[in-house]
Amino acid sequence: MKKNIIAGFNVTCVGDNKTFSFLPSKYGSTLADKLAKHVLKYHVDKVKYYSFLDRGSDERQYCSPGVDLPVVSIMRSKYGTYREYHTSLDNMSFISAKGLEKSYQIYTKCVDILEKNKKYKSTTKCEP
């Protein structure tokens, strides 16, 4: 699996209207990190950046020793940072169509850029 994954996204906490949050991969310099930071920089007004040490969702498994996948998280409110998290208030009234739509747009931009990212390789020796 590891050899086939060039960039991964842990999609979590994407439905509210609060500020976008970014949690990098363990190394912070993978293609997923660069891509996510680029999209957030140019398509979101404000972003709260976290350290990988602030992890707490499934990225713990994806980036754990021996697994080491290039996975990042783009969230709205980061888990554990809002009072509704894991309470009865963390329900459908907390999320909105607008919040989900903007998150969808951001992830779609990431995938679009990723699909257009090419590395060209010459098939001839010397100059063509």
Regions found by a protein language model. Name each.
Residues 1-128:
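Secretory-pathway/membrane protein signature
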